[in-house]
From Swiss-Prot:
Its main location: membrane. Pfam families: Complex1_30kDa (PF00329), Complex1_49kDa (PF00346). Keywords: Cell inner membrane, Cell membrane, Membrane, Multifunctional enzyme, NAD, Quinone, Translocase, Transport, Ubiquinone. This is NADH-quinone oxidoreductase subunit C/D. It comes from the Bacteria. In the N-terminal section; belongs to the complex I 30 kDa subunit family. NDH-1 is composed of 13 different subunits. Subunits NuoB, CD, E, F, and G constitute the peripheral sector of the complex. It catalyses: a quinone + NADH + 5 H(+)(in) = a quinol + NAD(+) + 4 H(+)(out). Residues 1-186 are annotated as: NADH dehydrogenase I subunit C. Its EC number is 7.1.1.-. GO terms for cellular component: NADH dehydrogenase complex; plasma membrane. The gene is nuoC. PANTHER family: NADH-QUINONE OXIDOREDUCTASE SUBUNIT C_D (PTHR11993:SF45), NADH-UBIQUINONE OXIDOREDUCTASE 49 KDA SUBUNIT (PTHR11993).
Amino acid sequence: MTDLTAQEPAWQTRDHLDDPVIGELRNRFGPDAFTVQATRTGVPVVWIKREQLLEVGDFLKKLPKPYVMLFDLHGMDERLRTHREGLPAADFSVFYHLISIDRNRDIMLKVALAENDLHVPTFTKLFPNANWYERETWDLFGITFDGHPNLRRIMMPQTWKGHPLRKDYPARATEFSPFELTKAKQDLEMEALTFKPEEWGMKRGTENEDFMFLNLGPNHPSAHGAFRIVLQLDGEEIVDCVPDIGYHHRGAEKMGERQSWHSYIPYTDRIEYLGGCVNEMPYVLAVEKLAGITVPDRVNVIRVMLSELFRINSHLLYISTFIQDVGAMTPVFFAFTDRQKIYDLVEAITGFRMHPAWFRIGGVAHDLPRGWDRLLREFLDWMPKRLASYEKAALQNTILKGRSQGVAAYGAKEALEWGTTGAGLRATGIDFDVRKARPYSGYENFDFEIPVGGGVSDCYTRVMLKVEELRQSLRILEQCLNNMPEGPFKADHPLTTPPPKERTLQHIETLITHFLQVSWGPVMPANESFQMIEATKGINSYYLTSDGSTMSYRTRIRTPSYAHLQQIPAAIRGSLVSDLIVYLGSIDFVMSDVDR
């Protein structure tokens, strides 16, 4: 893979004209076929004509060292954006983020659209996982994807009026009329939830027998949240299924347009509510790219330490609940004892437990307290023995292996087609962990390994990779404990928010800055930035657009759970209902991460 650690600082504005893919595109389509946008995303951003979209996408997919994964796809309302110098005229735009694993490089394609012609060809013919992303973009922006197999709402109820991420759509409850749920409206909403197989291209039966359609969820305990799957069954065999999401949708991306850069940090904790500080990492790193902030080494190590603590915390819950889904109850109670020790440590450091909101733009909220090292030492002495007991008592159990090995299995090709990341991707033999492939927050300075599977990702392999990931996280924590740098816990930068307290008590200028940044929020330079990280469940990323304001113009959150749930039908067809329960337990998802 290409060494990304030797590049310029992440916050440099670059057009990436030196990236080989730009030359390959120009050789194929001509030197004037595209507009290349300079950003702080760290990714080549290329505006293309709508008519070229499918041809360019197909070209990139067939290159030597191809762009094999559609990582993200979404839209933007450009109508109120003032800083668009050098960009094609657009009322709306759609972007396509592609990844080449072999190159360890990305490219972002953008298509400009006029308000009176919001049509673009579907990308599902090239990448099947474009399905949900296009549905969501239509749902929230009203952009139509011609040729889409079933373009319907996915986040909002089917009866919803309007497209919430448009700039002319209200962002506050006080801008709406008071909500009333009449009997007639309740009946309408219930009718809208009725599943009609024909709408999904499903048959109600064959010549000899009828299929049964079964609702699993949205309140089934094995659905792991407000999640509904409609199963088309031939006896116990799953002929097909339709995942139904959106019940946990909170409008997190819309909130990003009404909160200051600083005050949005608590919202990031709640995107994937088990990840804690892991969720804060991509957001603050993306904002720091916009601001041009380089944080001290101590900040990097503290952030890594908190992230790995939350990774262990999340993995323990995942492993124990998976074992519970298969039928063994005891490990989940042991795991909560271990997780309690992590929460005690996190609370001692941050003051909070599940949702610390502790990372800051330019640093962390405060320095490590006295005694943090003793608490971490006690945990590191405790956890390895417990992990070994889980493996011996439950994960090596013959019954558990028989229930999970070979279930919901897929290979590398399928994983890449569906945008699978994290342990699900690495189980197929693809060695791609962002902490190693594209180090951030100083991960390149840590000695740890990436567990990789043998070529097939099944339920058992995914779980066992997470067990090994726990051990690697313990290795990282040991290094944090032994090599914590001295130095400040905030960067000395005008946009560090809030600025160091001692400065505000001595200088009127910094006191004014503190007042403005806390009351109105810091003003970030107009630009775009992007940051992906290896979160607890796969790759999580924030793509931020600043228009030179105290708030984000567009906050795009790409979560791993969303992509993983879209893959369910492809992985489970032909299996039994009982296998689906095991598969759901092996995915590692929470619905807040899916629905945002």
